[in-house]
UniProtKB/Swiss-Prot annotation:
Gene3D superfamilies: Bira Bifunctional Protein, Domain 2 (3.30.930.10). NCBIfam families: lipB, PRK14342.1. HAMAP family: LipB. PANTHER family: LIPOYLTRANSFERASE 2, MITOCHONDRIAL-RELATED, OCTANOYLTRANSFERASE. Its main location: cytoplasm. It is an enzyme of class 2 (transferase). This is Octanoyltransferase. It comes from Legionella pneumophila (strain Paris).
Amino acid sequence: MIIHNLGIKDYTEIWEQMKEFTATRDSNSCDELWLLEHYPVYTQGQAGKPEHVLNPNSIKIVQSDRGGQVTYHGPGQLVAYVLMDIRRRNLGIRTLVVKLEEILISVLEHYRIPANIRSGAPGVYVGEKKVASIGLRVKNGCTYHGIALNVNMDLSPFLGINPCGFAKMEMTQMSHFHPNIQLEDVSQHFVQYFLTQFK
């Protein structure tokens, strides 16, 4: 597993790089984990419906090829893109989603933030509020896209959408529980727990 820390990047640029990586990899290519933040952007998943974008203001909307509905990415949110040959690892996509949820819960529990999952609504929650989203794409047995964990960000753009297609879905973030939390520290813990699941 190769880990890349990419800093803050434009969504469309990284999306194109993910597609190119996935299209050109072969059975000997190492899996990769890309860690980054994005400049403010709304992304629509393949199941996304226009009516879930309520008031985008000046924030760009990108129609993506990942699974799921609309979400928001912005600075202070840890994004981890999972470029993995799940066929080689004998993993089903649902199993991968469950493992990613477990990793996110482990990270949150490390900070003593009680997290849970909800049936029929992928992602991770603190109480009824969503703290992390998951959206993947599989092509030729290989995944791209990944997770987004709200660490210490401006949550107000989520008010301009129905996050993940759920009206009035409330969002939260780790800084509500730890005001001085640093994204770099959270990223390190995410990698640690990720590598315990995926060598």
